[in-house]
Amino acid sequence: MELDLLTAISPIDGRYRGKTDALAAYFSEFALIKYRVQVEVEYFITLCELPLPQLKGVDKNVFETLRNIYRNFSEADAQRIKDIESVTNHDVKAVEYFLKEEFDKMGGMDDYKEFIHFGLTSQDINNTSVPLSIKEALEQVYYPQIEELIAQLRTYAEEWTAIPMLAKTHGQPASPTRLGKEVMVFVYRLERQLATLKSCPLTAKFGGATGNYNAHHVAYPEFDWKAFGNRFVAEKLGLEREEYTTQISNYDNLSAVFDAMKRINTVMIDMNRDFWQYISMEYFKQKIKAGEVGSSAMPHKVNPIDFENAEGNLGVASAILEHLSVKLPVSRLQRDLTDSTVLRNVGVPFGHIVIAIQSSLKGLRKLLLNETAIYRDLDNCWSVVAEAIQTILRREAYPHPYEALKALTRTNQAITEASIKEFIEGLNVDEEIKKELRVITPHTYTGI
């Protein structure tokens, strides 16, 4: 069976491929191989720039030709590496052999081929390639999409800034708020957590078989290989080298990235659930698209499917991020292989997250404000002004104001505008205080 949108096992590469396609450039098998080639090429160039004595004869003019190997990397190139891997049974060694073939094609590079992957272990390539792919996926896909979501929420927050709304705590009526402010809560939370994510350093392991530059030092003890590694990782890859490691990355900073992404997911889940609830409360209607069906049995249905889709995908993403976060920093002694297969799944939560962001945006852009329903709930809940009245009475040293309002409102009788006004008129306070109390309504008692 040929792999296509209908035969793919994962919905990320099947049903939702149209939403996740941009991530293929960072997390596909092709992308991983390309990143490995890039790191190997840049490492060789940096050895030439040092220079190692045996590499002094390399013409600097070939550097751009070398870089074109990964800049112009094709699916045919990736397939060649996979063919080599079928013999070597080692993915990174296959990249090394591929580059030696490319050196042969260039001509004049035969004396330098053994400096490809010189002194390195596979994880020096993997633990630079993967964080580099994550860095670029964040910058080029994730950040723009999450910032688009925040911008849409901010637009609504500003548009609805003056819309009073009954708040609900414990599912029960509470002091009124403003719809725009409630949306702004999510803007604030997302921006804060996004800033935290952006502050997480993306680090890489680069230090030989057990993190000590053993091979480098024994061959060239005169060079400061730690300084070399720091410079290479920072200047050529835009990452930060982990100073002390085993054979593999410590993954602590990558774990912090995943935890930060998970917190953003949590905020988005909260947001999607709230908008779902507001739709259920009829505070929003949804734009209807001709031809769409809401239920196979109930023709009238217009379901909040986009918010539900987002919530579901965010849950899957967070579950995987949690495993990545707690598993990757743990490895037996100087290294076991469990991180390798787990790390190949890094793109999966990214896929579910971008699906969720796009679904959230789609749901938000379908919303039609239903002020009638919002105002109806306010008009039917005059009990919420009790807090305002008792607070002013406290200010005036009125005896037992809380208890007086409790006796009025904590009953099974409906509290109406008339009953509140009757209570105010019966108070033993100055007329000026009564005037102050009379203007308080569920529509105006919304704070600042």
Regions found by a protein language model. Name each.
Residues 181, 255-263, 388-395:
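Short, well-ordered beta-strand elements within core beta-sheets of diverse protein domains
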Residues 193, 240-242, 246-332:
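Glycine-rich anion/phosphate-binding loop at the beta-strand->alpha-helix junction
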Residues 43-46, 102, 149, 153-156, ...:
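Amphipathic alpha-helices that form helix-helix packing interfaces
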Residues 2-213, 220-232, 294, 307-309, ...:
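A helix-coil-helix interface module used to build multimeric assemblies
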Residues 2-29, 61-71, 293-448:
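Catalytic-core signal marking the mid-to-C-terminal active-site face
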Residues 134-135, 142, 183, 250, ...:
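Amphipathic alpha-helical coiled-coil segments and their boundaries
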Residues 158-161, 202, 276, 283, ...:
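Alpha-helical coiled-coil oligomerization motifs
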Residues 223-247, 251:
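Active-site-adjacent "gating/activation" loops or surface patches in catalytic cores
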